[in-house]
Amino acid sequence: LIGSSFGAAVSVYTAGVDERVSAAISSGGWGDGERKFRGQHIGDEAWPAFTKMMDRGRKHREDTGEPLMVPRYEIVPIPEHLRRNLAPGSVMMFPADTAISMYEFKADNVVGQISPRPLLLLHSSEDSVTPTEQSVEMFKRAGQPTDLHLVADVDHFMFGEGNPRIITILKDWLEKYFPV
């Protein structure tokens, strides 16, 4: 099971709770929503604005029964130079409930249950979207066999960059655990 970013967090969580998953690959994933968001909404204004948005979302849902819609970049800030990696027509407004559920999401709590099945953690060494420490922490909590690769010269959307090093890491790992 493979995922990137939020999909990577979901792939790790799913592998941790479902033994039918034979292996997991996480690219730029995260294990603790609150810690991830604290690393993304840095500064005296950004973190309070983010937590107020979640509070407004909860109140709006309670008062109206409807979700409060917020711009995607208020949930996960993506630098301008990486926004071209989003597919044309991508959804740009999300319910505040999305931020709340991500904030509460903790793949860290189940990553250790993946073992003895293999886990591959890939992360940019200087990820401008998801803090690199998220994959490092999952590695610390994981059992074996787990491989962690922190890769220079790529950013958050490493599979979209066509970097041959990423392809080689992935190919070699798959050949090791799933020889043909």
Kindly give the residue locations of the regions a language model identified.
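Conserved alpha/beta-hydrolase "acid-adjacent" motif
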Residues: S128-Q134
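Primarily recognizes the serine-hydrolase "nucleophile elbow" in alpha/beta-hydrolase
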Residues: L1-T64, M93-F94, E126
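Catalytic histidine-centered segment of alpha/beta-hydrolase-like enzymes
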Residues: V154-I167
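Short, conserved loop/helix-junction motifs that constitute active-site signature segments
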Residues: G112-S115, R141-G143
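Conserved alpha/beta-hydrolase catalytic His-Asp/Glu region
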Residues: D63-V91
